[in-house]
């Protein structure tokens, strides 16, 4: 199902652009930064509710799809869509976005605008991860999440925040290299970056195992999953 109104793009870019607005508020207007962040997170959550209620559970096809050429020289598209698995994850993401703003309302007292902007940015990027149908678009959203996560750990982390930040960056970077290799391999073999077309592409069992390990390395660090959680 393709919609006239790009609801998925709205869910992605509302918190991302909202993060820029909150960041522009400045350090000395913390109360305004909190209120704006709550409004933006609340509106994003309401949008996700309309996505959830408008989802047709009688079909397994991708819904609310959007498709626009992005980097035509490499057949990369701005392609979005959701299925019955990704819709609840988007709803959960936007719900937690509201909770994060509320949880940091009194706890975060320094650089409030930066803190709120980081989480709004992360929220939009996570929605992008759950709705991307182009592998490079997915990779861009997935890796861009490293930026706000890196800043949050480095600026508001515990006593060992510098060590934790460096370790997190190295782990994530290493895992991302394995994923990128896997994505490039799939593109070379299939001639497309479309994740939906990859579903239909035949691969040898050994190749599937190696690709699984590459993607597992990237996802394990971001989740984080034992034994790379510390």
Residue ranges and their predicted role:
Residues 1-7, 21-117, 191-202:
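Transmembrane helix-loop-helix hairpins at membrane boundaries of multipass inner-membrane proteins
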Residues 10-29, 217, 224:
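N-terminal signal-anchor/start-transfer transmembrane helix
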Residues 13-17, 43, 141-148:
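Membrane-embedded alpha-helical segments of multi-pass membrane proteins
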Residues 18-21, 40, 44, 89, ...:
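Hydrophobic residues within membrane-embedded alpha-helical segments of Major Facilitator Superfamily
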Residues 164, 210-230:
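Short helix-boundary/re-entrant hairpin motifs in multi-pass inner-membrane proteins
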């Amino acid at each position: 199902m393709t919609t006239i109104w790009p609801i998925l793009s709205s869910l992605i870019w509302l918190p991302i652009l909202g993060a820029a607005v909150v960041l522009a508020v400045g350090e000395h207007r913390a109360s305004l930064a909190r209120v704006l962040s709550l409004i933006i997170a609340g509106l994003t959550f309401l949008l996700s509710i309309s996505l959830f209620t408008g989802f047709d559970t009688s079909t397994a096809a991708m819904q609310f799809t959007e498709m626009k050429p992005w980097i035509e020289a490499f057949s990369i598209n701005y392609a979005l869509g959701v299925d019955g698995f990704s819709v609840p994850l988007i709803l959960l993401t936007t719900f937690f976005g509201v909770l994060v703003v509320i949880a940091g309302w009194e706890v975060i007292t320094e650089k409030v605008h930066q803190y709120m902007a980081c989480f709004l940015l992360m929220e939009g990027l996570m929605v992008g991860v759950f709705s991307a149908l182009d592998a490079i678009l997915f990779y861009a959203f997935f890796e861009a999440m490293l930026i706000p996560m890196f800043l949050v750990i480095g600026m508001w982390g515990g006593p060992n925040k510098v060590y934790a930040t460096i370790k997190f960056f190295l782990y994530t970077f290493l895992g991302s290299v394995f994923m990128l290799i896997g994505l490039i391999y799939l593109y070379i073999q299939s001639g497309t970056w479309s994740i939906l077309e990859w579903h239909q592409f035949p691969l040898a069992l050994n190749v599937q195992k190696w690709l699984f390990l590459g993607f597992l390395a990237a996802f394990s660090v971001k989740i984080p999953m034992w034994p790379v959680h510390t």
